[in-house]
Design a protein with these regions (language model features):
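The feature captures the beta-strand-to-loop junction immediately N-terminal to the Walker
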Residues: 68-69
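Conserved ABC transporter NBD signature motif
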Residues: 91-99, 111
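Conserved ABC ATPase signature
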Residues: 172-176, 180
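Helix-to-loop junction immediately C-terminal to a conserved catalytic motif
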Residues: 83
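Conserved ABC ATPase "signature" region
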Residues: 98-99, 149-167, 273-277
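P-loop NTP-binding/switch modules centered on Walker-like glycine-rich loops
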Residues: 195-198, 202-206, 210-288
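Short catalytic/signature loops enriched in Gly
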Residues: 4, 8-23, 36-43, 48, ...
């Protein structure tokens, strides 16, 4: 690379041109297992945590893919696999046409400019010993993106983009509110002009009163900068607002993926149905009329997941085939709506004696 800082900045802004609608990221059979070892002097693997198990999807430039599911279903682990914070246990990950599945840290360096993360906790993700200007400037310095003056100009520009001002550059994280800290995290993620931003539950640690501000900021930035998002959350109301498509995860697997509105209007997988039944409805009359599906029991252990369909111990539609044969993601309904279920809701299968109770929402 040239030693001229101005040239370095120009090189940073260039990269493979992916037109809106073209595939930016493709995941095929991704797996991430965490070994459980036992022993003192000689440790041996006695079990594995199946955190992400055979996950496949593609993401097109300019779209937002929402990723939802209960706590512990593997959403955040999948995000860290995509960003290559974690090494993969198996599968193939392609970004901008390049296979990055087994790339070394050095080989990943140019990829990280185009793939950034916004983390869940704005309190823990910012170094309390650094001033805000230095935090946002870190990616620029690491990637040699200009001289000192160019970096300072870029930092001030980023602060203004996320709704802060130049006067905040010398303050420390503890001097900001939770919403402002998350804006700083967004500014840091945007520093290198990425193509893909993975937002890992970016509003779950914030007060309800300021969640909408951060969501609207991310929405506006996508329109202005042409960003592509993977938006992770457990709040399906939030995901519906920001997503073009939504993938539902359960115990390390994607069980349904669909255009956002169709998922909410016509869910196919029983787990999705249960999640949607728990979403609050602002109209008290409608809320009183609809049914809430209460899943009994806890999520099974990812160390020893159930055979067949992983959801069958809690599913009110489960039959014998669900216990022995694992369902595959299959096209259901319109193009792009896939679900992994032996008894999809569209078939209208009457539920047998169930592992769940159905109660009228109060």
């Amino acid at each position: 690379m040239t030693d001229d800082p101005g040239t370095q900045m120009a090189v940073l802004e260039e990269g493979p041109e992916i037109e809106p609608g073209q595939v930016l990221l493709q995941a095929e059979h991704l797996r991430k297992y965490f070994p459980i070892k036992h022993g003192v002097l000689i440790q041996r693997e006695v079990a594995r945590v199946h955190a992400v198990d055979d996950v496949s999807f593609e993401l097109r430039a300019g779209e937002t893919l929402g990723l939802v599911g209960e706590s512990g279903c593997g959403k955040s682990t999948l995000a860290r696999c995509i960003s290559r914070i974690y090494d993969l246990s198996g599968g193939t990950l392609t970004f901008e046409g390049r296979d990055i599945s087994r790339s070394s840290r050095r080989q990943l360096r140019p990829v990280r400019r185009d793939l950034q993360m916004v983390f869940q906790d704005p309190y823990a993700s910012l170094n309390p010993r650094k001033r805000v200007g230095a935090i946002i400037a870190d990616p620029l310095r690491i990637h040699h993106a200009g001289n000192r003056e160019q970096i300072r100009t870029r930092v001030i520009e980023l602060l203004e983009v996320v709704g802060l001002s130049a006067e905040h550059v010398n303050r420390y994280p503890h001097e900001f509110s939770g919403g402002q800290r998350q804006r700083i995290g967004v500014a840091r993620a945007l520093a290198l002009r990425p193509k893909l931003v993975i937002a890992d539950e970016p509003v779950s640690a914030l007060d309800v009163s300021i969640r909408a501000q951060v969501i609207n900021l991310l929405d506006d930035l996508q329109d202005d900068l042409g960003l592509t998002y993977i938006f992770i959350a457990h709040d399906l109301g939030v995901v519906r607002h920001v997503s073009d498509r939504i993938a539902v995860m359960y115990l390390g697997k994607i069980v349904e993926i669909s255009p956002a509105e169709e998922l909410y209007e016509r869910p196919v997988h029983p787990y999705t149905e249960a999640l949607l039944s728990a979403v609050p409805v602002p109209d008290p009359d409608l809320s009183a009329q609809r049914q809430q599906i209460v899943l009994e029991g806890d999520v099974p252990s990812p160390i020893s997941p159930p055979s067949g369909c992983r959801f069958h111990p809690r599913c009110r539609y489960a039959t014998d085939i669900c216990k022995v044969e694992e369902p595959q993601l299959t096209l259901r309904g319109s193009a792009g709506h896939l679900a992994a279920c032996h008894h999809p809701l569209s078939v209208g299968t009457a539920p047998p004696e169930s592992a769940a109770a159905v109660v009228t929402g109060q």
